[in-house]
């Protein structure tokens, strides 16, 4: 019984287990993978030596984490792309609350002023508006 050759469709890509690049790896790719694995093992060993040091003082600094934190916080503008959505959301979050609070205060004062002019508001002990 022979099975038909698997053809990936638009909605269902080729599974990783059937990917020929998974098994037919060139020697250069294998060498690069081995180098990356060696670097990872060396960094892990250095971290564990620092972590398990009984005479450790202070924090252990992870350079990759420091780079990530720098890129995430202080280095925002080189990676920021202004778009219409960003601009609209900035204006909405910046001016929206101010306009909302202004509207609430204005309508409350207008309502109170109308009641004062009609004489329906009891202003006992009122020294200000």
Swiss-Prot record:
One of its GO terms (cellular component) is mitochondrial inner membrane. It comes from the Eukaryota. The keyword Iron does not apply. It holds the Pfam family NDUF_B4. It is a single-pass membrane protein. It is found in: Mitochondrion inner membrane. Complex I is composed of 45 different subunits. Belongs to the complex I NDUFB4 subunit family. This is NADH dehydrogenase [ubiquinone] 1 beta subcomplex subunit 4. It comes from Pongo pygmaeus (Bornean orangutan). The lineage of its organism: Eukaryota, Metazoa, Chordata, Craniata, Vertebrata. The gene is NDUFB4.
